[in-house]
Amino acid sequence: MSSSMWYIMQSIQSKYSLSERLIRTIAAIRSFPHDNVEDLIRGGADVNCTHGTLKPLHCACMVSDADCVELLLEKGAEVNALDGYNRTALHYAAEKDEACVEVLLEYGANPNALDGNRDTPLHWAAFKNNAECVRALLESGASVNALDYNNDTPLSWAAMKGNLESVSILLDYGAEVRVINLIGQTPISRLVALLVRGLGTEKEDSCFELLHRAVGHFELRKNGTMPREVARDPQLCEKLTVLCSAPGTLKTLARYTVRRSLGLQYLPDAVKGLPLPASLKEYLLLLE
């Protein structure tokens, strides 16, 4: 082997070793106790190198280290790069930390980036009920009705967990409440699936009431019969049967229609400018 080839191979090996140490330092797995992120980068660690499935920027978001996220971006980390799971750093940040989300968005992160299952960061923020991340993403142009591989929206993801705070924010931004996924489920039916497992709390009940106000009318029965899992809970089955049997009133259907006609914007601001009495504005905003 020529000396020049040996030097190249040694250089690559050294850089790889530094980059691996960078990942471990960010994750606080310190093989070298005195390592720090800035020194490793200065020494030649590649801020865009992938180790296994991990990239440094994604790892910093996983541990909610906003200062490290900003440092990596300043040193050239690719803000929209995909890791081994086809996820961007923003997907991880959206689950955990608003500060990381804000830094990534400031550096040009795509709020509508898709992972391998076509999930957006907003799907994950809604699922984890990270309400401030939900709001930050929506304010930065995230699509409130983005569809994943199953045609589920962020509202569906929030509803299946009974995440009242995230559901409320998504509805404020005009999320479509009557969306149907590929197997016939709606946001409110996803929430019912949680309630029938006996996992509902007062917050989940409030979430159901909010979705019910938003949708106006919903139907869970097939050929006049409630799903078997609902029928196992007589009290819940009776309540849902009454709600499904009652036709939507003109008032509730008009609310849904007006909200939808306002389009994809922050509805509290849009409704504020309408020439309506305060009581009707509150009604449109699902406050009663």
Swiss-Prot record:
Gene name in the database record: ASB8
Compartments in which it is found: Cytoplasm
Domain SOCS box: 235-288
Pfam families for this protein: Ank_2 (PF12796), Ank_4 (PF13637), SOCS_box (PF07525)
GO biological process: intracellular signal transduction; protein ubiquitination
GO CC aspect terms: cytoplasm
Domain remark from Swiss-Prot or TrEMBL: The SOCS box domain mediates the interaction with the Elongin BC complex, an adapter module in different E3 ubiquitin-protein ligase complexes.
InterPro entries: Ankyrin_rpt, Ankyrin_rpt-contain_sf, ASB8_SOCS, SOCS_box, SOCS_box-like_dom_sf
Function: May be a substrate-recognition component of a SCF-like ECS (Elongin-Cullin-SOCS-box protein) E3 ubiquitin-protein ligase complex which mediates the ubiquitination and subsequent proteasomal degradation of target proteins. Inhibits IFN-beta production through the IRF3 signaling pathway by targeting TBK1 via 'Lys-48'-linked ubiquitination, leading to its proteasomal degradation.
Organism: Pongo abelii
Family: Belongs to the ankyrin SOCS box (ASB) family.
Record's keyword annotation contains Lipoprotein: no
PANTHER family: ANKYRIN REPEAT AND SOCS BOX PROTEIN 8 (PTHR24134:SF9), ANKYRIN REPEAT-CONTAINING PROTEIN DDB_G0279043 (PTHR24134)
ANK repeats, residue ranges: 52-81, 85-113, 117-146, 150-179
Protein name as annotated: Ankyrin repeat and SOCS box protein 8
Description of post-translational modifications: Phosphorylated by TBK1.
Pathway annotation: Protein modification; protein ubiquitination
Modified residues (Phosphoserine): 17
Major subcellular location class: cytoplasm
Binding partners and assembly: Interacts with TBK1; this interaction promotes TBK1 proteasomal degradation.
Keywords in alphabetical order: ANK repeat, Cytoplasm, Phosphoprotein, Repeat, Ubl conjugation pathway
